[in-house]
Amino acid sequence: MTGQQLRAGLEGVTVAETRLSDIDGEAGELVVGGFPVETLATNATYEETVFLLLRDRLPTAEELAAFRTDLAERRGLSAEAHGVVRRAAKDGEPAMDALRMGLAAASLDADCADDRTTAKRVVAVVPTIVAAYWRYREGESPVEPDPELGHAEFGVRLDR
């Protein structure tokens, strides 16, 4: 190669520009949405962090309540999407492949008018798909989403 330097790995290569986060590897800092990740991990809920990533700011109390309700309403899977996940589990497909297939099937029955709506649907339905896949693999029926639970609690309880 004349005039070009071959680099191993991606060192020094810009893969993408983003406003969502910043990494200072030498200082050991990760900033997400303008906040050090340690601050978010200790002071923000999962829903607050997702809201921050979608809206570029933390939510008010009223916005957070509405966002939690919105996510809860988007958690369900259609019978067709369940069928895809059930078949993937029965056929022994790897979990990531089953998640990909489940997300594709879930997107067919969702009203995703824009990228933000699509992102909320993905965030909401991933725990439902993952838990359904593992329960189907064990020969069990999936647990229906509980809209009263926060998103993180919902995700943890689905596998029980």
Indicate where each model-derived feature is located.
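Hydrophobic alpha-helical bundle cores within soluble ligand-binding/oligomerization subdomains
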Residues: 1-160
